[in-house]
């Protein structure tokens, strides 16, 4: 296993930072300071060292620093050095990662590893951030799409190929629906050969998506069940989508692929009239049940819901930390400690230490991280910049 840990992080014209450098040297970090000081901006920068839009889901234009009167965000960059993989011949020099845009308003970001421009997916070979933010506080009250997005990020952390399958599925889905809606509006039949080809692509990508979700869910459930000694609520997980259910009961990928393609072909008139596809892995949902209280998570208190989600993220981190062929995750926990009681804050600190992972945590009050003192780097975030404490 390659231990994923940041040795340094440098932001240039990113959000509120003109330029800032943090040097954790592989240690966990707790960031504290007033609301609006820029703590979450640092976590967002780390989250962009992975494919996708990061923990805020922002566009590239939004993250560039913008001064009053400027119409668009500036060109920005995030650079980091990470620990190199340990091999039989020792450890190499640190790996240099970088991402950003070279022109203000650019719609595509550049990714470089050791100075070489590479596809964003290559970042997953070196760091795999997993995050939990206040935006997930309403996870059980939001639409199913938000829970799918949350769960798919957990899947991706363990199986980076999942993102490619999801992108291929979404692209084919858009093409198919454009054909069907155009046909419905014009009254002319859609190109059947083209539709069949698209549905074959949807079947292939959708079957892989459903299988990866099912595989991740079973592994996560086993991990959660083994964590009964932690002071976090136990969860029972379920995937409600029909295609994920097939994967969960052991139906082969080829069979799911064939069934999904056939179901889509049969649903052409219905989907064209509805203006959306009514079957497929894009319709599934994640259900979480509080075991000890025997009730759905949506019916639990806000505090218990947050603890359930945190335990789910920690279970995924623990599972991935034992992987033999991939870097372990970097945990990004935004304003999580503030919602935990003293016992759970202590347990969270112990868990991070025991797993040997690098974690970045934020909070307004330094006292929230008393249990991490001596085990993590404390950094005060203010309008003056980043100030590392000396009590590590």
UniProtKB/Swiss-Prot annotation:
Keywords: ATP-binding, Cytoplasm, DNA damage, DNA repair, DNA replication, DNA-binding, Nucleotide-binding, SOS response. GO terms for biological process: DNA replication; DNA synthesis involved in DNA repair; double-strand break repair; SOS response. Gene3D superfamilies: P-loop containing nucleotide triphosphate hydrolases, RecF/RecN/SMC, N-terminal domain. Belongs to the RecF family. The RecF protein is involved in DNA metabolism; it is required for DNA replication and normal SOS inducibility. RecF binds preferentially to single-stranded, linear DNA. It also seems to bind ATP. ATP binds at residues 33-40. PANTHER family: DNA REPLICATION AND REPAIR PROTEIN RECF. Pfam families: SMC_N. GO terms for cellular component: cytoplasm. It is found in: Cytoplasm. InterPro entries: AAA+_ATPase (IPR003593), DNA-binding_RecF (IPR001238), DNA-binding_RecF_CS (IPR018078), P-loop_NTPase (IPR027417), RecF/RecN/SMC_N (IPR003395), RecF_2 (IPR042174). One of its GO terms (molecular function) is ATP binding. It comes from the Bacteria. Its main location: cytoplasm. This is DNA replication and repair protein RecF.
